Amino acid sequence: MITVNVDLGERAYPIHIGADLIGRTELFAPHIAGASVTIVTNTTVEPLYGDTLRAALAPLGKRVSTVVLPDGEAYKNWETLNLIFDGLLEQHADRKTTLIALGGGVIGDMTGFAAACYMRGVPFIQVPTTLLSQVDSSVGGKTGINHPLGKNMIGAFYQPQAVIADIGALSTLPDRELAAGVAEIVKTGAIADAAFFDWIEANVGALTRRDPDALAHAVKRSCEIKAGVVAADEREGGLRAILNFGHTFGHAIEAGLGYGEWLHGEAVGCGMVMAADLSVRTGHLDEASRARLCRVVEAAHLPTRAPDLGDARYVELMRVDKKAEAGAIKFILLKRFGETIITPAPDDAVLATLAATTR
């Protein structure tokens, strides 16, 4: 097992990475102070890992309840969030009740938001079971739900007590979900660590084949990078925005098609291709680097052509973005691997990118 620490002073927490961690009681024990625990999971993950987690919690002598939600991005909304609150209230959960998010990014985001809101804040633990949630969404305290007009526009910054990333859970992940997680790994290397990007380029096949050593290294390095960024800029005042490379275009794809039509990682993969194209058109990135990025995204079995939503619709959706200021769209663009710039882009360059990258 490897442990990466997120250094946030009194709110620091560990990220434990390794195989067969969901069943290890000692990883949960230090982070559960109250008398009760509520596991939040979904209809896909519950039959796979619910019993394992409950067995791990049993020696602690806590009252354990489970809320099982429908699976998918389409359910990341107020209605589903209220199912968590219903479960907490029915179980008479108090301020010391610990929530455990057992699932992918949707479960983690909603459980974290519920924890931030219930009784104005209760502790929670992330147990991410998808590659995307292990390398990205479970780390850093971003929680929330979608709105029909924008992705993740309603939420809170609220840090977990711990992240327990069980690499073994990736063995049950569908190929499409695995590829979606590789997208966030590619993003992390592209924005922050050129040497890591080189490694990803050389090992993308091993990642898609689920080589355990490759996956463990990718999760570890991605978490190290994100932990460093979050420690420096927890609330996305500046530096943390670089983690949104590919997300401005990607969120527009998700909202434009309807949440759940494309997986988040698929939209981010394609969004990185679009952002790299715009980086070249605005004079920040060389063509050879753009081509390298596109090849890696394609090798990860991710889409590289965006849906044709229409130029006006793309622009409209990208204006509903947390980085936008006074209606001006800000993009995370590449200067070289490991270095980004946060900047507006000329309308003609954006339109040219849309023309070149949509089908």
Swiss-Prot record:
Signal peptide start and end residues: none
Protein origin, superkingdom: Bacteria
One cellular component term from this protein's GO annotations in UniProt: cytoplasm
Listed GO biological process terms: amino acid biosynthetic process; aromatic amino acid family biosynthetic process; chorismate biosynthetic process
UniProtKB keywords: Amino-acid biosynthesis, Aromatic amino acid biosynthesis, Cobalt, Cytoplasm, Lyase, Metal-binding, NAD, Nucleotide-binding, Zinc
Positions with a binding annotation for Zn(2+): 184, 247, 264
InterPro entries: Dehydroquinate_synthase, DHQ_synth_AroB, DHQ_synth_fam, DHQS/DOIS_N, DHQS_C
Cofactor: Co(2+); Zn(2+); NAD(+)
Cofactor: binding comment: Binds 1 divalent metal cation per subunit. Can use either Co(2+) or Zn(2+).
EC number, UniProt record: 4.2.3.4
UniProt subcellular location: Cytoplasm
Residues that, per the record, bind NAD(+): 71-76, 105-109, 129-130, 142, 151
Record pathway: Metabolic intermediate biosynthesis; chorismate biosynthesis; chorismate from D-erythrose 4-phosphate and phosphoenolpyruvate: step 2/7
Keyword Nucleus in annotation: no
Catalytic reaction list: 7-phospho-2-dehydro-3-deoxy-D-arabino-heptonate = 3-dehydroquinate + phosphate
Primary location group: cytoplasm
Gene3D superfamilies (alphabetical): 3.40.50.1970, Dehydroquinate synthase-like - alpha domain
GO molecular function, one term: nucleotide binding
NCBIfam families per record: aroB
Family stated for the protein in its record: Belongs to the sugar phosphate cyclases superfamily. Dehydroquinate synthase family.
HAMAP family: DHQ_synthase
PANTHER family: 3-DEHYDROQUINATE SYNTHASE, 3-DEHYDROQUINATE SYNTHASE, CHLOROPLASTIC
Role description: Catalyzes the conversion of 3-deoxy-D-arabino-heptulosonate 7-phosphate (DAHP) to dehydroquinate (DHQ).
Protein's name according to its UniProt entry: 3-dehydroquinate synthase
Organism: Burkholderia mallei (strain ATCC 23344)
